[in-house]
């Protein structure tokens, strides 16, 4: 509607005649072929997110890592495999003497090693914590993919809005060029006016080519994120209704610990601490029980035996002590990594909140101040041009300013949506849930 009003204003005040039925298309798809509206249906963000959750290769791989980490948990808590030994002792060197000599016998033994109490349980708990960290890494990966998908979606939305404005601009300068040409032919305008109008139209054509290429590039990126052939066409993003969003600061502050980035680091720190505790138990020996049966022929009695074997940590200075120091260093590293992530998330949240606030203020400024003022300026310049007080170049500058302000407005709309997407990824949930939790 705005484009139609601007077009009518330019035509009427420049003195051009608007022929009946000559409507101006304000929205066009990158392809100039007929039937574009059928080729480019409405593209819904929720549908893209749903497909990405199911088909995106990074998400599928991260989900597979969860399964593999869970399979490792029972392995870490299992006892070592038992050992079975079958042997024979012969009395004498020259011949097989079983049944002839009392010392000849067949032997069967079985042994089982039991780690010192607490070792296996700590090992299993550490593996469980690592699996939980892998799950949080999956959530982090999934949310990162969705964040990138949203960012590309809103960039595509802005590119389409830019194409709308360029198409509007192109149509206006085609009409201005036609009017300038008629005025030049009748001696009412200079050649400079005609040249200026032509130059602006050619620049608009160049911008349209670049925007169409940008749209195709963004469509390929989105297709890649949803595991779709990059060459397949996508629809046009559905229309946004820019509204100011109230973010509960207290709820946002409390939700920092729910960030998948922080929860992943927490799980890794807990796993490192459990491994450190397990390393301290390595000073204690493992116990191996062995039972043996010796089979002798008649009239000799069979024999049995039971032994207990302990491993002695004799070289603890270079082995067990070094292992404890190693695990302690890993735990310290994980702790500082967690604290660094906390600070990074908190800092990034403040940065995004600042970006959102700035974008909303600029949107308000463009919508209520710059664009209305630019429309008034355009109207005044056109009136002055008709009266012969200014050159056409002043009208063109005023028109360009108005269209540029409209473009910057939609740029801020897209930037705000992109910042909101990044904020939701950081806290791991929709912003709407923050306000719901305080009702």
Q: Where do the model's predicted regions map?
A:
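Periplasmic alpha-helical coiled-coil/stalk elements that build and connect Gram-negative outer-membrane
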Residues: 18, 141-258, 352-355, 359, ...
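Amphipathic alpha-helical coiled-coil segments
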Residues: 61-73, 141, 145-166, 175, ...
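Short, charged, amphipathic alpha-helical segments
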Residues: 124-128, 191-199, 392-400
């Amino acid at each position: 509607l705005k484009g139609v009003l601007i077009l009518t204003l330019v035509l009427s005040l420049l003195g051009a005649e608007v022929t009946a039925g000559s409507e101006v298309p304000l929205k066009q798809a990158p392809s100039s072929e007929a039937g574009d509206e059928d080729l480019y249906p409405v593209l819904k963000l929720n549908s893209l997110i749903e497909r990405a959750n199911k088909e995106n290769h990074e998400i599928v791989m991260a989900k597979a890592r969860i399964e593999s980490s869970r399979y490792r948990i029972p392995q870490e808590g299992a006892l070592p495999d038992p050992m079975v030994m079958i042997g024979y002792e012969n009395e004498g060197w020259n011949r097989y003497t079983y049944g002839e000599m009392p010392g000849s016998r067949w032997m069967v033994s079985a042994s089982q090693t039991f780690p010192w109490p607490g070792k296996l349980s700590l090992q299993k708990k550490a593996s469980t914590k690592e699996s939980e960290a892998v799950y949080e890494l999956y959530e982090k990966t999934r949310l990162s993919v969705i964040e990138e998908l949203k960012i590309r979606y809103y960039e595509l939305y802005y590119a389409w809005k830019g194409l709308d404005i360029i198409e509007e601009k192109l149509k206006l300068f085609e009409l201005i060029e036609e009017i300038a040409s008629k005025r030049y032919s009748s001696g009412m305008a200079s050649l400079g006016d005609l040249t200026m109008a032509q130059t602006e139209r050619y620049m608009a054509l160049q911008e349209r080519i670049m925007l169409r290429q940008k749209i195709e590039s963004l469509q390929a990126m989105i297709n890649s994120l949803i595991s779709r052939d990059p060459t397949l066409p996508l629809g046009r993003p559905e229309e946004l209704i820019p509204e100011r969003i109230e973010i509960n600061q207290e709820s946002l502050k409390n939700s920092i610990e729910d960030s998948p980035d922080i929860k992943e680091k927490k799980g890794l720190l807990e796993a490192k601490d459990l491994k450190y505790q397990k390393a301290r138990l390595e000073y204690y020996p493992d116990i191996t029980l062995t039972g043996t049966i010796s089979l002798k022929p008649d009239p000799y009695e069979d024999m049995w035996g039971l032994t207990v074997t302990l491993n002695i940590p004799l070289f603890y200075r270079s082995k067990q002590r070094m292992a404890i120091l190693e695990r302690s260093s890993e735990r310290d590293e994980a702790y500082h990594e967690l604290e660094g992530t906390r600070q990074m998330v908190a800092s990034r949240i403040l940065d995004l909140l600042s970006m959102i606030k700035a974008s909303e203020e600029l949107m308000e400024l463009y919508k209520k101040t710059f664009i209305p003022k630019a429309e008034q300026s355009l109207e005044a310049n056109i009136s002055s041009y008709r009266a012969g007080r200014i050159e056409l170049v002043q009208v063109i500058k005023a028109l360009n300013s108005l269209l540029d302000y409209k473009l910057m407005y939609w740029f801020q709309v897209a930037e705000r949506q992109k910042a909101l997407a990044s904020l939701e990824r950081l806290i791991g949930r929709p912003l709407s849930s923050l306000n719901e939790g305080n009702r």
